Amino acid sequence: MTHPNLLVELFVEELPPKALQKLGDAFAGVLLAQLQAQGLASAASRVTAYASPRRLAAHVTEVAPQAADKAVSQKLMPVTVGLDASGNATPALLKKLAALGADASAVPGLRRAPDGKAEALFLDSTVRGATLSEGLQKALQESVAKLPIPKVMRYQLSSGCEQPGWTSVSFVRPAHGLVALHGTEVLLSVSVLGLTAGNATHGHRFEAAVDPVVIRSADTYAQQLAEEGAVIAAFADRRAEIARQLQAAAEQVGGGVRPIQDDALLDEVTALVERPNVLVCEFEKQFLDVPQECLILTMKANQKYFPLLDAEGRLTHRFLVVSNIRPDDASAVVGGNERVVRPRLADAKFFFDQDRKKTLESRVASLAKVVYHNQLGTQGERVERVRAIARAIAQQIGDVELARQADQAAQLAKADLVTDMVGEFPELQGTMGRYYAQADGLPAEVADAIEDHYKPRFAGDTLPRGDVGVVVALADKLETLVGMFGIGNLPTGDRDPFALRRHALGVIRMLVEKELPLDLETLLHSALPAFGDKIQDPTASLADFIYDRLAGSLREQGYSAQEVDAVLALRPQRLALVGKQLAAVRAFAALPEAPALAAANKRVTNILKKAGDVDAHVNPDLLREQAEKDLYAALQRFVPEADALFAAGDYTGSLQTLAVLRAPVDAFFDDVMVNAEELDLRLNRQGLLQSLHVAMNRVADLSRLAVA
């Protein structure tokens, strides 16, 4: 049987734009879940969320007018407790029935059924299914209560409020209307936030053809709002329309220009308008002398405009505005937006011109007045630490010129923090440093490194372009990690105010993707001297932290937990080689010999752990059993070949060479007693196993591949 569809709308004052989409999805999602839980909507029911600046709504398909009655079986008590020897109800049973709204007349109808080892009494009854009005009342209250509201407003209801007992309400914004339609039927008994449901809503604040818009049925809601109310109610439809208009406007301008791609800005603008209208505006070309990042940021962040870029990605003097009105003559709207943006761009030009009057080097001294952390000193002290770490890293790489340029870039990397432009737009730190370094005539490698030393800023971000940038970026992140761990300022749960997890992943990415010939623990220790006595040595805990981040990253890349565990158990120092080690482990695990060798390796590990400190020396004269002689001979024959492949970086070949050891290893454990009574035999056999263990576990701890 087909049931009518349901439409519910809350009409409110302008909702916070950055939360709108989440609010709309949550409102619709909870509403559907609650209706399904009460049996009013089925698993086949579908919900469509509507969210605009002044409304949250949901359209649910196939909603029953009343839920089906439910058979309920209530366990009462054991028969021996509820009935006496004559079969009459005991006072305990009568009391229980009374609590459930029944009396002694229900006793003959009680059902007996096994309950564990005893027999119990059950009261079978039928519970009437909730009507849609009853169920929607509960669902609506739950939907409102569970909205992810960023900040709650408390407001007084009007004196004409129809809901008795309601005087004030807490909600994200004041609500002024409630629509609840089941097909064409208005669910008049439903209420929320002091509002009683009806079928009238409001369209666009200025351009609605009629007001109020009387919704005829649940299925005509979106169409009527569009035709009579001049509102595109669905967030996704409105977003798509804005994107279409942006592209069309860019094509109208011509010359291959395109609007800047920014999903967050598009989402925010979608949440600001109900009837989008994209207009082309422009500003004076003289402002293009200012770095385009400054102009783009001020237009996006302050005005919600879409700058137009040419085919090479350069900013043009035109931009697109998403208006909420469609006047016959748009010139006033265009002119108003052009007037508004001009002072913003003039401010950016003023900051840029003023900042260039001083060199970056002359600003470094001012960093001594900027506090970085009360336990780690000023930004000036931090700069000196980053310089020292950068020099140490460059020396490990062995490039004198790299060390000189890295030192210069590290000295100037934070200088733009005390410029007017970065003071106004903190997001431009590093970027403005590059521009000012170029204006000061510094080498391109140094200028690029100043911008790139913050990279990667987020997951998926690019890495520094050149070697100088990589060295300074590594030094900057190591300074933060070592410093914060050294004072015990560690991330906890969701709290990571200094982005230490991101910094650790940045270090990992640079070491791996740039294939740097640097050892992790050497890097960590090289950062310590720069701090003097300000911190405790955190290298052990910091190394654990970095390996944990590496493990998580590798699992996200598709490696199994066993593979990752096997490689990282060895605490590899050259992270750039971890990928080759994992590939070798995966190839080894696919061999038919792998399970037996992994299990044997686990057994060897346990034996050696119990034996304590075991020397890998083997005396051939003490080999008595044929199986141990065969294993020794196999090690002598194949381990040198495997070692040579390992030294050449062929980890896969190294492990595959050792696969031939399966047969002699199996025979050894079948025929040889390792813990012989004679001490010299026992030590010799343990030494043989130690030799096997060393040979097998150079690439990874293969015992971690054994099935538990």
From Swiss-Prot:
<dbReference type="InterPro" id="IPR015944">
    <property type="entry name" value="Gly-tRNA-synth_bsu"/>
</dbReference>
<dbReference type="GO" id="GO:0005524">
    <property type="term" value="F:ATP binding"/>
</dbReference>
<keyword id="KW-0436">Ligase</keyword>
<keyword id="KW-0547">Nucleotide-binding</keyword>
<dbReference type="Pfam" id="PF05746">
    <property type="entry name" value="DALR_1"/>
</dbReference>
<dbReference type="InterPro" id="IPR006194">
    <property type="entry name" value="Gly-tRNA-synth_heterodimer"/>
</dbReference>
<dbReference type="Pfam" id="PF02092">
    <property type="entry name" value="tRNA_synt_2f"/>
</dbReference>
<dbReference type="InterPro" id="IPR008909">
    <property type="entry name" value="DALR_anticod-bd"/>
</dbReference>
<dbReference type="GO" id="GO:0006426">
    <property type="term" value="P:glycyl-tRNA aminoacylation"/>
</dbReference>
<keyword id="KW-0067">ATP-binding</keyword>
<dbReference type="GO" id="GO:0004820">
    <property type="term" value="F:glycine-tRNA ligase activity"/>
</dbReference>
<protein>
    <recommendedName>
        <fullName>Glycine--tRNA ligase beta subunit</fullName>
        <ecNumber>6.1.1.14</ecNumber>
    </recommendedName>
</protein>
<comment type="similarity">
    <text>Belongs to the class-II aminoacyl-tRNA synthetase family.</text>
</comment>
<comment type="subunit">
    <text>Tetramer of two alpha and two beta subunits.</text>
</comment>
<dbReference type="GO" id="GO:0006420">
    <property type="term" value="P:arginyl-tRNA aminoacylation"/>
</dbReference>
<keyword id="KW-0030">Aminoacyl-tRNA synthetase</keyword>
<dbReference type="GO" id="GO:0005829">
    <property type="term" value="C:cytosol"/>
</dbReference>
<keyword id="KW-0963">Cytoplasm</keyword>
<keyword id="KW-0648">Protein biosynthesis</keyword>
<dbReference type="GO" id="GO:0004814">
    <property type="term" value="F:arginine-tRNA ligase activity"/>
</dbReference>
